[in-house]
């Protein structure tokens, strides 16, 4: 399954039909079985009552949960998440993080989460790979990474402004700029 950053719901399909889509496209299940499975998946993400709504009628957090229900529609062994917490309010963010962990445990699946949200990821992850400049910069349990003395890891986890990842884009000195040398 795959949950993209903005959910990628089909705007012309209802919540129900968005979740049913992979079942209809990739299985030979009858409509009654699909109905039951879709309602179970929507119930798992707290949206069974929203089955009849269109994507334009639900919030961004709800849309993300519909996309999550669609991602688990076929009970995949691997679920990939692209920035699942981006743009969510604090309540939706917490709910989504808890749902990812609970569904992962219930389905006995493996999740790959690409994100910059350290706190939420560390709360639900068993093992983390940190990527910097296209390479694995560090790996380990959240606890191990929190104890890391590696400068990149320390800066990223603690949201520090100073470290190997520069905040300022390279430029001439500020003195040169105000001295009239730079435009």
Where are these predicted regions, by residue range?
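ABC ATPase "signature
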Residues: 139-140
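Catalytic Walker B motif of ABC-type/P-loop ATPase nucleotide-binding domains
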Residues: 79-82
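Conserved catalytic motifs of ABC-family nucleotide-binding domains
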Residues: 75
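Conserved ABC ATPase signature
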Residues: 54-58, 62
């Amino acid at each position: 399954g795959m949950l993209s950053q903005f959910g990628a719901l089909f705007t012309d399909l209802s919540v129900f039909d968005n979740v049913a889509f992979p079942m209809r496209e990739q299985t030979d299940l009858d409509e009654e079985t699909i109905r039951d499975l879709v309602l179970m998946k929507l119930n798992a993400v707290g949206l069974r009552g929203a089955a009849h709504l269109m994507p334009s009628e639900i919030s961004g957090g709800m849309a993300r949960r519909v996309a999550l229900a669609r991602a688990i529609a076929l009970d995949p062994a691997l679920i990939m998440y692209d920035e699942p917490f981006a743009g969510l309010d604090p309540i939706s963010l917490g709910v989504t993080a808890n749902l990812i962990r609970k569904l992962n445990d219930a389905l006995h699946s493996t999740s790959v989460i690409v994100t910059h949200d350290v706190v939420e990821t560390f709360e639900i992850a068993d093992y983390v790979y940190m990527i910097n400049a296209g390479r694995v910069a560090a790996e380990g349990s959240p606890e191990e990474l929190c104890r890391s003395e590696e400068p990149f890891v320390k800066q990223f986890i603690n949201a520090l402004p100073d470290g190997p990842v520069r905040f300022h884009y390279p430029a001439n000195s500020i003195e040169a700029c105000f001295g009239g040398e730079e435009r």
